[in-house]
Design a protein with these regions (language model features):
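Hydrophobic alpha-helical segments
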Residues: 1-176
Length: 176
């Protein structure tokens, strides 16, 4: 992680400091923190950020939790687009049409169900699906998770996403 932090340019110093801070939030367990970071890095599509976070996450997560975090990002990558269309179209008829999309991993991921739900919430926020955010956030609160913990995961998603964008733009500039 140190190499990743050092690769963040000076103009994004706030992001560098924020990344260090959001990975140490007291509101989240180690598994919640690193699962959120993994799911968010993958959803952000930044190869440098994803490599660094996956490498560090292996020190903090069981193989099952790591795979579940990856699965949360994968399934939300599909669901967030599908359900965002429902919301954005404004056409209620779409809600009555079966999705016909396989989503078994939501039940078979093998991680703590609340943690998986948290990772899905963070990725849904990152992907901008209001319907999915509302649905997952509601489940988390019903299962007893405090708003402070939920927003802590969204902090991770927002910072990881921003760092990924910065580093991808820096890589593009270097290739000029």
């Amino acid at each position: 992680m140190e190499a990743l932090l050092n690769s963040i340019p000076d103009y994004a110093k706030d992001l560098k400091l924020n990344l260090s801070a959001v990975l140490k939030q007291a509101e989240l367990t180690e598994q919640q923190t690193w699962g959120t970071a993994v799911a968010s890095a993958i959803a952000s599509r930044g190869s440098e950020v994803t490599r660094a976070i996956l490498a560090e996450a292996q020190l903090h997560l069981t193989p099952e939790a790591l795979n579940a975090a990856k699965a949360a990002s994968a399934i939300m990558g599909m669901n967030n687009i599908y359900y965002r269309f429902h919301h954005l179209s404004g056409n209620e008829a779409y809600s009555s049409i079966p999705a016909r999309l396989r989503m078994q991993v939501i039940r078979t991921h093998g991680a703590d169900p609340v943690d998986f739900e948290l990772w899905c919430t963070a990725v849904s926020a990152l992907n901008g699906c209001g319907t999915c955010v509302a649905s997952h956030e509601k489940v988390l609160r019903e299962k007893g998770m405090k708003e402070e913990a939920i927003i802590a995961s969204v902090r991770i998603a927002s910072v990881v996403h921003a760092v990924a964008a910065v580093l991808e733009s820096e890589a593009a500039q270097r290739s000029l």
